[in-house]
A protein has these predicted regions:
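Juxtamembrane/disordered regions of integral membrane proteins
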Residues: 2-190
């Protein structure tokens, strides 16, 4: 049990906070995507070109869908945190911890299946096997090297998911602080 006295539920406020923190984390994640080519040692612009080839979605629409998905994840995270006493965000450090756990869950349940079952086979079929005219030889070599060293991508993306889950939890802790001000805490953290 995370608290001795319960605070009143405010679902509409929780949804608003979830939208806000999801958008904040989504924009922060998008800022990381702007430099992902350099961080992974790829030619400039290859990340978004690969998204277009793998999923058939234009980069601007992909950015919009990603930010919408992060807003939905923020709402779900805050609704679960409000309704499950163990994960109720009554302090900012607890928000950071539960956000990191939430980021790891999103990585495991959403990113890994999409990466392994959709993205890698689509890149292999559309780019590497068919020699797409949209990609230069240097870009195809970089993608081949990256897919062979796939663990680097998985570790990097796991790190990014946990970091931005922590940002989402931090922002939730800041915004929900007043709601749980009078809640008696057990060992000051939970």
């Amino acid at each position: 049990m995370s608290s001795i006295s319960d605070s009143p539920s405010d679902t509409k406020g929780t949804i608003k906070v979830g939208l806000g923190v999801g958008l904040i984390a989504g924009v922060a994640l998008f800022a990381t995507f702007l430099s992902v080519d350099q961080q992974l040692g790829l030619p400039h612009g290859l990340f978004f070109k690969t998204m277009d080839s793998a999923f058939g979605v234009e980069p601007v629409l992909a950015i919009f869908l990603g930010i919408c998905a992060s807003a939905i994840i923020g709402v779900v995270y805050n609704l679960i945190s409000e309704n499950w006493k163990t994960f109720r965000i009554i302090t900012t450090p607890k928000g950071i911890l539960t956000g990191a756990v939430g980021g790891a869950i999103v990585f495991g349940l959403i990113f890994v299946p999409l990466h392994a079952l959709v993205f890698v086979p689509a890149i292999d079929a559309n780019v590497l096997s068919n020699g797409s005219a949209d990609f230069t030889d240097k870009e195809i070599k970089s993608l081949t090297s990256l897919l062979i060293n796939n663990t680097h991508v998985l570790w990097y993306s796991a790190f990014v998911h946990v970091i931005f889950g922590s940002i989402m939890g931090l922002m939730s802790g800041f915004l929900l602080h007043d709601r749980y001000r009078n809640v008696t805490r057990i060992r000051s953290f939970w």
